[in-house]
Amino acid sequence: MSASELKEMEQKMEQAVQALSKNLASVRAGRANPSILDSVFVDYYGASTPLNQLASVGAPEARLLTITPYDKSAIGDIEKAIQKADLGLSPSSDGNIIRINIPALTQERRKDLVKVVGKYSEEAKVQIRNIRRDTNDQLKKMEKNGDLTEDDLRGFQDDVQTSTNDYINKIDQLAKNKENEIMEV
């Protein structure tokens, strides 16, 4: 096992953390954030198109999102897509711009969102552990083939475990920060 293989493992772990960050950004914390609409796809001329390719999304105020379609004829389709996305948002249009008022979160909704954050963080931890398992399997094969000594195997496994612990801690910190942001009244 070379340093490049360890680097590759850490890159995969970093990708899992980045995916978690992206998922957490889509969890609404009571303030307007354009990324909460990243999961919205609009049926535009028969094709499922991401909202951010059809319109610019902005947050001019703490509890307001504005969506300015590049093609005004798509306003109705965009409104339908936002309602269908089941984000708990109600879009309103004046013909040129769609406005979405972000309602304040109830305590019950906050608790539900914390559970969603927990689910996302657990999925990321499982990805990290799977990467660790794959790397350890690769190390054991190398030892079996005679490419590694038993001492080298243990040393590399310790390195893998240290990296795993570091990335699990990063995930826990991201989740904790998001939970605090959600529970902030």
UniProtKB/Swiss-Prot annotation:
Q: Give the keywords, sorted.
A: Cytoplasm, Protein biosynthesis
Domain of life of the organism encoding this protein: Bacteria
Gene Ontology cellular component list: cytoplasm
HAMAP family, per the entry: RRF
Q: What's this protein's family per the entry?
A: Belongs to the RRF family.
Keyword flag Cell cycle: no
Matching NCBIfam families: frr (TIGR00496)
Question: Main subcellular localization, coarse class?
Answer: cytoplasm
CDD domains recorded = RRF
Q: Which organism is it from?
A: Oceanobacillus iheyensis (strain DSM 14371 / CIP 107618 / JCM 11309 / KCTC 3954 / HTE831)
A Pfam family hit? RRF
Q: Where in the cell is it found?
A: Cytoplasm
Name used for this protein in its record: Ribosome-recycling factor
The role this protein plays is:
Responsible for the release of ribosomes from messenger RNA at the termination of protein biosynthesis. May increase the efficiency of translation by recycling ribosomes from one round of translation to another.
